[in-house]
């Protein structure tokens, strides 16, 4: 059989709408309010494990704030900031507090649990602080099934189970794989099945 190089298209532009909330509904609502200028709290800090959606949410809020003309600053991976960068963020916080604006920051742990300057950690903890909980397997499965339905694709349970067991577990990768599987199904003129998925995964896949 002819080998095909299937391009798995880049994930959609991050938005609050295409973020699967799981147990993070309250955080999502607060971010929406802040990024549109409707929230009482202008300072939000998100923390959680890699793949929990922190960067997705920061980028989504940046875009939303631009649309609404809101002055918003984001700071990702604050646990990696150098001493000078921490001072800059501290000064930015104070400036936004005095002049108006929104700051949304994110890191791997709660502010007081990281090796940050005391003054910066205190500032970050003053606002709303949310731990982002990763999706459960059931929630990931629901998200994949919904994504498949949007494409008019009938997705067998065994395909979902295989994806969750053998692929990277972040949603962009999982959904991009489903998109490629849908294209491969049309190319091969075969229904979506587990054998077809295994065949797809034998091909060189471009996921960049």
Describe the predicted segments one by one:
Residues 111-125:
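Short regulatory helix/loop adjacent to the ATP-binding pocket of P-loop NTPases
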Residues 4-26, 162:
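Dynamic helix-loop-helix/coil hinge segments at AAA+ ATPase domain boundaries and subdomain interfaces
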Residues 40-57:
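Walker A/P-loop nucleotide-binding motif
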Residues 127-139:
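Conserved AAA+ ATPase "SRH/arginine-finger" region at the nucleotide-binding site
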Residues 127, 142-154:
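Conserved AAA+ ATPase "sensor/coupling" helix adjacent to the nucleotide-binding pocket
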Residues 161-165, 172-186:
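C-terminal helical "lid" of AAA+/P-loop NTPase domains
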Residues 33-41:
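Phosphate-binding P-loop
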Residues 68-88, 92-95, 99-107:
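Conserved P-loop NTPase "ATPase switch" module shared by AAA+ and STAND
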């Amino acid at each position: 059989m002819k080998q095909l190089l299937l391009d798995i298209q880049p994930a959609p532009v991050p938005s609050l709408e295409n973020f699967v909330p799981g147990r993070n509904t309250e955080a999502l609502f607060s971010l929406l309010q802040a990024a549109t200028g409707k929230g009482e709290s202008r300072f939000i800090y998100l923390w959680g494990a890699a793949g929990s959606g922190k960067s997705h949410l920061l980028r989504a809020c940046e875009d939303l704030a631009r649309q609404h003309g809101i002055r918003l600053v984001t700071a990702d991976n604050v646990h990696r900031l150098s001493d000078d960068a921490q001072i800059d963020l501290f000064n930015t916080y104070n400036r936004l507090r005095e002049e108006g604006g929104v700051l949304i920051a994110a890191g791997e742990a709660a502010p007081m649990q990281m090796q940050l300057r005391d003054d910066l950690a205190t500032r970050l903890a003053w606002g709303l602080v949310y731990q982002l909980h990763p999706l459960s397997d059931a929630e990931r499965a629901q998200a994949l099934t919904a994504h498949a339905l949007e494409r008019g694709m009938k997705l067998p349970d065994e395909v979902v189970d295989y994806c969750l067991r053998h692929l990277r577990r972040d949603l962009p990768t999982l959904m991009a794989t489903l998109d490629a599987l849908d294209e491969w199904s049309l190319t091969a003129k075969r229904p979506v099945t587990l054998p077809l998925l295994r065949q797809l995964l034998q091909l060189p896949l471009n996921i960049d």
